[in-house]
A protein has these predicted regions:
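Short catalytic helix/loop segments, enriched in acidic residues and glycine
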Residues: 1-9
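Short beta-strand scaffold segments in enzyme catalytic cores
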Residues: 6, 50-52, 174-177
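Short, conserved phosphate/pyrophosphate- and ester-handling motifs at nucleotide-, phospho-/glycolipid
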Residues: 8, 139, 199
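Conserved N-terminal subdomain of the carbohydrate kinase-like
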Residues: 9-105
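Phosphate-handling active-site elements
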Residues: 14-16, 182, 209-215
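Short, charged, surface-exposed secondary-structure boundary motifs
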Residues: 48-51, 113-118, 192-200
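Conserved phosphate/ATP/ADP-binding segment of small-molecule kinases
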Residues: 112-184
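Short, small-residue alpha-helix embedded
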Residues: 192-215
Length: 215
């Protein structure tokens, strides 16, 4: 949520952040300084955190803390990025948010994540209602969980569900399906030590550009 919010502020958008964090969260003052508005964010539990193991830019996540869920959201904006981490947004709240906004950009990772007996995070195939979603950002594993397919076949399934723009990320390869055309770019061959936050930054930049340029 912080990565999305800060990126949107850099792009000169007003931001209202709906999230939960505990008393251990160190960036409250910084968010206020950046004029990011948030209310009822303080949780009785510690901030959701993961232990991250990196192997050649591949991530293994282990759940360390789980914050309180978000109980309710009243939107006062036409556009929203929905980007849960782990189990903080219920299906009912997800439906409400979608119906209250005209432009919805979804990063579904938090709806797909599960935890095993060792607290290791894994993804599970999930029947998520994607109606009223304008754009979605997924990686190959998330695409497989949502559609049962990968690559172009999976993207087309999402398109048939009514999503206008589908962004597929695969390490340095990024593809966008929009209006029956697929656009692809390959990022420079850089050594990646930690990719945390890249997806959030990309989502926010894409969403803000769509709102500003309508394209």
């Amino acid at each position: 949520a912080c990565y999305c919010s800060l990126t949107a502020r850099i792009l000169k958008f007003d931001v209202r952040l709906h999230t939960k964090f505990g008393s251990d969260f160190p960036l409250v003052d910084y968010l206020i300084e950046q004029k990011i508005v948030f209310e009822n964010a303080l949780s009785t539990k510690q901030t959701t955190q993961f232990t991250l193991n990196l192997v050649n830019s591949e991530r293994e996540l282990f759940l360390q803390n789980k914050c309180d869920p978000i109980s309710n959201i009243t939107l006062d904006a036409d556009s929203v990025i929905i980007s849960p981490l782990f189990d903080e947004i219920s299906v009912e709240l997800f439906e409400k948010i979608k119906n209250d906004a005209s432009f919805v950009l979804l990063d579904p990772q938090g709806f797909l994540r599960r935890v095993n007996s060792e607290n290791k995070i894994y993804l599970e195939q999930t029947d998520l209602n994607l109606s009223n979603v304008s754009a979605i950002k997924v990686n190959q594993d998330e695409l497989k969980c949502l559609t049962g397919e990968s690559n172009v076949d999976g993207i087309k399934i999402l398109q048939k569900k009514g999503i206008d723009s589908i962004i597929l990320t695969d390490k340095q390869n990024i593809s966008l399906l929009s209006e029956n055309r697929i656009y692809s770019i390959t990022l420079p061959n850089l050594e990646l030590n930690d990719t945390t936050g890249i997806g959030d930054i990309f989502c926010a930049a894409f969403g803000c550009t769509m709102l500003k340029e309508k394209d």
